[in-house]
Swiss-Prot record:
This is Chloride channel protein CLC-b. Broadly expressed in the plant. Homodimer. Interacts with PP2A5. Voltage-gated chloride channel.
Amino acid sequence: MVEEDLNQIGGNSNYNGEGGDPESNTLNQPLVKANRTLSSTPLALVGAKVSHIESLDYEINENDLFKHDWRKRSKAQVLQYVFLKWTLACLVGLFTGLIATLINLAVENIAGYKLLAVGHFLTQERYVTGLMVLVGANLGLTLVASVLCVCFAPTAAGPGIPEIKAYLNGVDTPNMFGATTMIVKIVGSIGAVAAGLDLGKEGPLVHIGSCIASLLGQGGTDNHRIKWRWLRYFNNDRDRRDLITCGSAAGVCAAFRSPVGGVLFALEEVATWWRSALLWRTFFSTAVVVVVLREFIEICNSGKCGLFGKGGLIMFDVSHVTYTYHVTDIIPVMLIGVIGGILGSLYNHLLHKVLRLYNLINEKGKIHKVLLSLTVSLFTSVCLYGLPFLAKCKPCDPSIDEICPTNGRSGNFKQFHCPKGYYNDLATLLLTTNDDAVRNLFSSNTPNEFGMGSLWIFFVLYCILGLFTFGIATPSGLFLPIILMGAAYGRMLGAAMGSYTSIDQGLYAVLGAAALMAGSMRMTVSLCVIFLELTNNLLLLPITMIVLLIAKTVGDSFNPSIYDIILHLKGLPFLEANPEPWMRNLTVGELGDAKPPVVTLQGVEKVSNIVDVLKNTTHNAFPVLDEAEVPQVGLATGATELHGLILRAHLVKVLKKRWFLTEKRRTEEWEVREKFPWDELAEREDNFDDVAITSAEMEMYVDLHPLTNTTPYTVMENMSVAKALVLFRQVGLRHLLIVPKIQASGMCPVVGILTRQDLRAYNILQAFPLLEKSKGGKTH
């Protein structure tokens, strides 16, 4: 993931936000380390690439240009804006559904023909040839996926969900939603899943849906954007944030054919800000996805999609099965939840260590990333082909309606090397696609289909593969690997209960999968609805709710969710909803004192001063001050007035357009409107290197008043950091000004500026190491 850049970066913390000695606590440090200062240069892993991280501007910049544009908007323009939001939400659902269908078609056909070829050699008892075909095909598919991620789009590696979660929290993740990333994600997902790796396409589909939303919102790629006038309304971070939320919900819906589950996933897991209008649009996007998927299912059921049928869209329909359970079954159901919570937290802990180990390998260079992926693929292929030889052949049950044995790509009873009339239960689970393996485990009224020994082998194998496959340089999802592990242990528990319970083994498998997902991902409501829509059986609702609540509670007592752990490992500055208790013992004024002095500008500033500030600082916003001619109420005579806050990008725009004045004066409103259309200021343009200013221009002036946000959020210097963090996160700020409690003549009206990096727990602990030991320092 990280190459030589890591040697130049430093800091530490574990995934609970606790500081520690770098020598004795190296396993608990972020993969990308920050300098041991409060104002460190923000670096993080985006996908598998080290990137410079900035925050997004979710706050409305209320400068004079925005106010004028807002006042002059007609009803027709407002309707255009509303119509555009709903149209883009529809297009997000449409394209996500189409791409999900394409991925499923490709995976099912590629994997299907591969398994048919292997089965052909098995029937001829050419076992070595069958192994070579399986290994060769899987290595080739893995090579394609890995090379694309390593060489063309490192941000496409992994699930993408942690980066999306960070983006919706206010973190700008560079190159995360580009066209190249999306294409590599699509092709790489097809290759990795068709190669039989223990990966799912659910996480990548969430990322793909978000990429589609981002590209539609900005009118295309960075180099080929549509200059449509209507799209100017979407030229801001707030609307793009909402559209990407729709894209993430559409991705989950496309993965599980779960429209309500997709909306709830976006609400519960990825979105930081939510409101009713966004709820309606995300629901509309998922509804469009379902319509597209339903239409393609009808087409494919007629045999027009090659080997693709109902299988590719993960829909384990058990609506025709009537499950029965009684009060006495609550005890085994609770046991499933407890085991799921313990195993889920253990999986999170071990995966945390494996990702650190993989980081050491990936630091060595691109070739090592590809070799690691190929090694995992080789190990997986050998296990999938070789382990079924350890299982005993089982006789076919003549009372069942299904064909037994089968030699095709799917089916519940694979013959493998068994004689006629017998099947290999372990081959049924291993020599198939991951989707079909889940269907086989979820199958009902088949109490004797899988032996306990085969289930144990399958469970142990997929625990190992689930740990060592995630983290390689391919697109990957965590949903399906966890479902496979959970379904296996759930079915084993059902078989062990035997006649002591009335619950079907297939239902135990469903509950086991739900419990392990809740134990690892710590979601409840969205997972409950996803599993109900997945199985199409409302009878599962009561016991599914119990299992999810117990598993999440048990898991929370050990460690954070898997996505929170990955967020920390990547160094993404995600702000949690609940501040640390010790943050109430520190004021924002004390935090501001630990930073370098604040850099301010005058309302009418000299060009040379602006150039000097831009060259010598990396700040992205500067307070604009004015000498108060008429003292305001409560303002001391001769005190300086805070006019507002101006962004670095706007200063660069001023210099590039050379909007200079020969004399020091305030400009008229019409002068600014002629030079700066409001929608232009929404574009980020902070590259100052190519701006050439002459010596004569250096002596000119710039009136910053029209471009200044006159209503920035401010807090008193005696406010606690905990309270400031809650405000910063809930409002979606990029900068928060600290103002003094008492204004006096000659005193600067701004004590400091807080940014996202300043409010991160382990950054604060580097500057105030004794805070954690203070009263309330530990969470009880």
